């Protein structure tokens, strides 16, 4: 089973924030694949489907971002999912809004949700789809910036990036990730 995890924060006040862009992708995939996300015992919203003949799972952790590993790791253990079949989708300050970047592995890049997953999994060897949110340009603290909403000017590029990330996830169901990286990395 392939597991797609979109990182974000639970609650209405965070719904459309930059930090929740991973949730946007999971919502898009749930719509495409007709997956109903339900609360699971793993402190997250979870659903499964068969896509292109392959079993897939979608997850939106309901822990706060900094505790994402507390949802993801028990889920991986319970369903006996190989770490190689896990793709984590999240926001990236170092990419401009609208850009996506796929990686086979790596450090956290300062992202607390990814830090939590690395800590709980005990490895950096999992696939990622990073979606650019840019950096604050007006001196706004990063912690406030990631919890802010996209500007009207940014929204078209961001929504296009969400669709491209969802397309990459779809391709990753049946295609080696290295090929997906070649097709989607700019």
Curated annotation (Swiss-Prot):
This is Peptidyl-tRNA hydrolase. Transmembrane segments: none annotated. It catalyses: an N-acyl-L-alpha-aminoacyl-tRNA + H2O = an N-acyl-L-amino acid + a tRNA + H(+). It comes from the Bacteria. One of its GO terms (biological process) is protein quality control for misfolded or incompletely synthesized proteins. CDD domains: PTH (cd00462). TRNA binds at residues 14, 64, 66, 112. One of its GO terms (molecular function) is tRNA binding. It is an enzyme of class 3 (hydrolase). Monomer. GO terms for cellular component: cytoplasm.
């Amino acid at each position: 089973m392939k597991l797609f995890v979109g990182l974000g924060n639970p609650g209405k006040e965070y719904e459309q924030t930059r930090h929740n862009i991973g949730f946007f992708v999971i919502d898009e995939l749930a719509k495409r694949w007709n997956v109903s996300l339900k609360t699971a015992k793993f402190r997250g919203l979870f659903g499964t489907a068969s896509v292109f003949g392959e079993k897939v799972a979608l997850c939106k952790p309901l822990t706060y971002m900094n505790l994402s590993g507390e949802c993801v790791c028990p889920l991986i253990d319970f369903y006996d999912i190989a770490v190689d079949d896990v793709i984590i989708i999240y926001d990236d300050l170092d990419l401009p809004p609208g850009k996506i970047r796929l990686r086979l592995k790596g450090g956290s890049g300062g992202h607390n949700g990814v830090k939590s997953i690395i800590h709980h999994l005990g490895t950096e060897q999992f696939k990622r789809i990073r979606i650019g949110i840019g950096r604050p340009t007006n001196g706004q603290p990063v912690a406030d910036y990631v919890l802010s909403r996209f500007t009207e000017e940014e929204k078209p590029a961001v929504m296009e990036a969400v669709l491209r990330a969802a397309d990459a996830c779809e391709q990753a169901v049946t295609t080696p990730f290295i090929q997906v990286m070649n097709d989607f990395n700019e």
